[in-house]
Curated annotation (Swiss-Prot):
GO terms under cellular component: ribonucleoprotein complex; ribosome
InterPro entries given in the database record: Nucleotide-bd_a/b_plait_sf, Ribosomal_uL23-like, Ribosomal_uL23/eL15/eS24_sf
Name of the protein in its database record: Large ribosomal subunit protein uL23
Family membership noted in the UniProt record: Belongs to the universal ribosomal protein uL23 family.
Organism the protein comes from: Psychrobacter sp. (strain PRwf-1)
Subunit structure: Part of the 50S ribosomal subunit. Contacts protein L29, and trigger factor when it is bound to the ribosome.
Length: 116
């Protein structure tokens, strides 16, 4: 399994009341993942993307898309797979910090460009 495949496994975090509660109390992170991803691929992808994090357990479930109406038109949302990733005790995935670092670096480079 190559790293290019692992970078395509995780699609993004799931932010909900349940995922926040699980993250705070049990150290479980919730991600949207590729529909064809296996539990082993999900574990390796999380450990690759978030360095220093050890995954102890992965639970997955397939979420069926809801049927939605817009007037007379009937549509359907896409199906997706969700993964509950349990981390080793005392560890946490810091997703918000990475975004702040990128924003800080962009701000500092724009300030130096203005000074020159």
């Amino acid at each position: 399994m190559n790293n290019a495949r692992l970078y395509q496994v995780l699609k993004g975090p799931v932010f909900s009341e349940k995922s926040q509660l699980l993250g705070d109390s049990l150290g479980v992170q919730v991600f949207k993942v590729d529909n064809n991803a296996t539990k082993r691929e999900i574990k390796k992808a999380v450990e690759l993307m978030f360095e220093g994090v050890e995954v102890t357990k992965v639970n997955t479930l397939n979420v069926k898309g809801k049927t939605k109406r817009f007037g007379r038109t009937v549509g359907r949302r896409n199906d997706y797979k969700k993964a509950y990733v349990t981390l080793k005790a005392g560890q946490d995935v810091q997703m918000a910090d990475a975004g702040e670092e990128i924003a800080d670096n962009a701000a500092s480079t724009s300030e130096t460009a203005n000074n020159e």
